């Protein structure tokens, strides 16, 4: 459950390390984002010579949340930290690598490029 002002880790090699959610996309009154949802983020911490710099405003896909993800078979998945992958306006990831596991829910929401780059899909 990601909302405005939530801090997230960045799970790719775009150069950003930490981002903050400034808007959840998908409706004017939408408050929360879950895995697979697109949010607007501000980059709070970045490495030198990365593809992005501190202060940039980008879109991102949420790939891991500390809040439970419930599945139809009754199983539950949760992660230690919230994480996102930065994307461009066409929905393609900015980085060329994804760090850490991602969930199957990304496949259902048509983020196939992120799923294919991820080392593990839960």
Curated annotation (Swiss-Prot):
Pfam families: Ribosomal_L14 (PF00238). CDD domains: Ribosomal_uL14. The gene is rplN. Keywords: Ribonucleoprotein, Ribosomal protein, RNA-binding, rRNA-binding. The keyword Ribosomal protein applies. InterPro entries: Ribosomal_uL14, Ribosomal_uL14_bac-type, Ribosomal_uL14_CS, Ribosomal_uL14_sf. Part of the 50S ribosomal subunit. Forms a cluster with proteins L3 and L19. In the 70S ribosome, L14 and L19 interact and together make contacts with the 16S rRNA in bridges B5 and B8. GO terms for biological process: translation. The lineage of its organism: Bacteria, Pseudomonadati, Pseudomonadota, Alphaproteobacteria, Hyphomicrobiales. It comes from Parvibaculum lavamentivorans (strain DS-1 / DSM 13023 / NCIMB 13966). One of its GO terms (cellular component) is cytosolic large ribosomal subunit. This is Large ribosomal subunit protein uL14.
